[in-house]
């Protein structure tokens, strides 16, 4: 079993409303926003804040994201493994000559990793 946490470059009220109305709020133990952390992805600070709130370490964490220059680069900056959910192409993407730890093309493929 995994704990899910959310890191978003959004405002507290907006992100919590989205989670509530989508029915996803109960799945996430911690929700870290750029507003609450005073930092934006891909900066390491928002990830460090999330680690502190979740009482987690980079070594036991993984970032699942669909934006290579925000989610994946942020995870690389924070020293955690990443899963790039690539909805745009069927070719793996890189950022700053670095490849994500994993690339999937649909959320269903996450089952193969976890």
Residue map of PLM features:
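Asp-based, Mg2+/Mn2+-dependent phosphohydrolase catalytic module
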Residues: 3-114
């Amino acid at each position: 079993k995994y704990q899910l946490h959310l890191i978003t470059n959004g405002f507290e009220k907006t992100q919590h409303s989205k989670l509530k109305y989508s029915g996803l709020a109960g799945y996430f133990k911690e929700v870290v926003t750029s507003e609450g952390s005073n930092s934006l992805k891909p900066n390491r600070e928002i990830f460090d804040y999330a680690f502190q709130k979740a009482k987690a370490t980079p070594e036991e964490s993984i970032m699942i994201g669909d934006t290579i220059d925000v989610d994946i680069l942020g995870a690389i900056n924070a020293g955690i493994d990443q899963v790039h959910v690539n909805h745009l192409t069927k070719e793996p993407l890189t950022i700053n000559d670095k490849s994500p730890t994993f690339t999937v093309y649909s959320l269903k493929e996450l089952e193969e990793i976890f």
